[in-house]
Amino acid sequence: MSDNQRIRIRLKAFDHRLIDRSTREIVETARRTGAIIRGPILLPTKIERYTVLISPNIDKDARDQYEIRTHKRLVDISEPTDKTVDALMKLDLAAGVDVQIELLNKKSGA
């Protein structure tokens, strides 16, 4: 790959154990191929809360509360080699983890 490119990997999952395991696998795979890693960077957890009335008729005080937590991680791979890209493509991650991969150009001043 070109020297002025880097790979940014964003991971999302509802279960923090799955996302941590997947992040660890990505970092170990990239390090084995000789790439430079920045991260994993923990991004803010998005919490969505829902309140539902239990009683269909009266008693508005009876409610249940639910929440969904979306955990996010970010991994930057600088100076990726062709071996790095091949190893990342062959990597088998958990089904509950959403992976977004971006190919970025490094800025000339950074």
Curated annotation (Swiss-Prot):
GO MF annotations, alphabetized: structural constituent of ribosome; tRNA binding
SMART domains: Ribosomal_S10
Gene Ontology, cellular component aspect: ribonucleoprotein complex; ribosome
GO biological-process terms attached to the record: translation
Record Gene3D superfamilies: Ribosomal protein S10 domain (3.30.70.600)
HAMAP family membership: Ribosomal_uS10 (MF_00508)
Cross-referenced NCBIfam families: PRK00596.1, rpsJ_bact
Record's function text: Involved in the binding of tRNA to the ribosomes.
Record note on quaternary structure: Part of the 30S ribosomal subunit.
Record protein name field: Small ribosomal subunit protein uS10
Organism: Coxiella burnetii (strain Dugway 5J108-111)
Gene: rpsJ
